[in-house]
Structures are given as C-alpha cells and as structure tokens.
A protein has these predicted regions:
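Bacterial N-terminal signal peptides that target proteins for export
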Residues: 2-15
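Bacterial N-terminal signal peptides
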Residues: 13-26
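Non-catalytic structural scaffold of enzyme domains
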Residues: 32-260
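Sec/Tat signal peptide C-region and signal peptidase I cleavage site
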Residues: 27-31
Length: 260
C-alpha cells in the first residue's frame, strides 16, 4: 500500500487556500437561488472540454433524475502543473483545496473530482471531507472497485501518461479495500484524440489489442475516452469500463442525505 504524506508547507498552503477560496475559485453553473429540497453538488474540473463537461453533467442529472443543482469549478493550471511535475505540488494542491473549500461554503453536499491525474489528491482529502461533512469522491473510485470485482487482470488505457499512475493506484487501493489480489497493466495511446473520433477509436483498439489478450477487463482512465468504449469493447471482445456514469453514481451515494 502506498502512503501519501504531505509536508507542513502543504498544509500551510491548504489553510491559505481555504481562507482565500472565494477569490481564487469563482463558481459557475450555480443557481442564484437554491431549493433546499433539491440536492446541490459540486464538480471540480482540471481539464474541461465542452464535451467532457456536457457528458459529466448529463450523467449526474440522469443519476439524480434531473433534480440536482450543479456547481462547477475549473482550473486547468492544476492539471498542467501536476502533469509537468509528475506529482501534486504545493501550489496545485492549494488551488484544488481552494475549489473544494468554496464548494463547501456554497452549500454543496458532496464534491466530484473529475481529473484522474489528481486522483491521489482527491483520495488524500477523504478525511477532510468526513470532518467537513462534505464528502469528496474521485470520478474513478467506483469504477476501479467494479474492475476489481470483475476480474484479477486489469488493463488501464489512457491518452495522457499522467493519468496512468493515479488510476493504477486507485485500482490497487480498491483491491486492498475489497480483499482481492489484482494485476494491473497499462497502455498509453496518444495521438489524434479529439480530432477524428472514428480514426482514434480504431487506433485505440489496435494499441490495446496485444495487452488486452491477457486482460480480464479494460479500464479507461479518463472520462473523455468514454465515447470510444463501445467500439473498443466490440473490437476486442473485452468488457470496457468508462466514466462518467460510475462517478455520478458515487457522487449521489456520497451525499449525507441520500441515506446510502
């Protein structure tokens, strides 16, 4: 098991981010008035194409039966700094925590972190979420549990190298949580993603073909890859798990008032 420890400087930055959150993290997508009977949730993006936001928020609305207020937070610098450094640094952690703090102040009942590259940071904040009464869940957490329940040999597919390690660790944590041994392999399939969807899904299937032969199940590390899931599943004859549906389900389950 990997232990994630942050030095004192990190927590000083975290405290500063909580104090300055309203200045750092303006909310978009929030209703001016909120019906207390309608759940309010927050979504934190660090890479946010219009298609990704539409897919994530559509999945959330479907999970909640359309009755949900969604607060949206975006900060591309968190992803950029983390991907470049290969780890979560003080500044990116403080910015992320600032978004969480503003979501809590704004009345969110639970927070969904969409970026797989910062999955370790979202995981490390579970204790904060418990104390604050505003749980935070990573979009891949429940998907990784489903992968572990479905097979021992799990293949992680990603288009960004920075998404691989955190997703692998999420799977290993899920294995430990469920008491199951797992074997994780990875394939990074870059090139052309987002330009020609049809061409890319074929490229993705071919890049995964060899590794998929020895895998029980395939996990897409990034929710932005979800449109390719059906094609890859059909081409390779392997079950493919993709978000945002698992993240939406976990977000609803995390709400204190959900009773789940």
């Amino acid at each position: 098991m990997t232990s994630w420890k942050f030095h004192a400087g990190f927590w000083r930055a975290a405290a500063l981010s909580f104090a300055c959150a309203p200045l750092l993290c303006p909310v978009s997508g929030a209703a001016a008035e909120h019906d207390a009977a309608i759940p309010k949730v927050a979504v934190i993006y660090t890479v946010a194409t219009p298609e990704l936001k539409e897919g994530v928020e559509r999945a959330i609305r479907e999970e909640f039966g359309g009755k949900v207020d969604i607060l949206r937070y975006e900060d591309a610098a968190v992803f950029g700094e983390t991907a470049k450094a290969g780890k979560v640094g003080r500044e990116s952690a403080a910015r992320f925590l600032g978004m969480y703090a503003d979501a809590a102040r704004s009345g969110a009942g639970a927070v969904l972190s969409v970026c797989s590259t910062v999955a370790d940071l979202a995981y490390s904040m579970r204790g904060v979420g418990e104390l604050a009464g505003v749980p935070i869940v990573g979009i891949n957490d429940e998907m990784c549990r489903e992968a572990v329940r479905s097979g021992k040999r799990i293949l992680v597919a990603a288009t960004f190298p920075s998404a691989v390690g955190p997703t692998r660790r999420s799977i290993l944590r899920a294995g430990a949580e469920l008491g199951r041994e797992v074997e994780v392999s990875e394939v990074v399939a870059g090139g052309g993603f987002g330009s020609d969807a049809g061409a890319f899904e074929k490229l993705l299937a071919e890049k995964l073909r060899g590794a998929a032969k020895s895998a029980d199940i395939i996990v897409f590390a990034q929710a932005s890859m979800e449109p390719c899931a059906g094609f890859v599943e059909g081409a390779l004859g392997k079950r493919v798990l993709a978000n945002p549906k698992f993240g939406a389900k976990a977000l609803k389950s995390a709400l204190p008032e959900s009773g789940e």
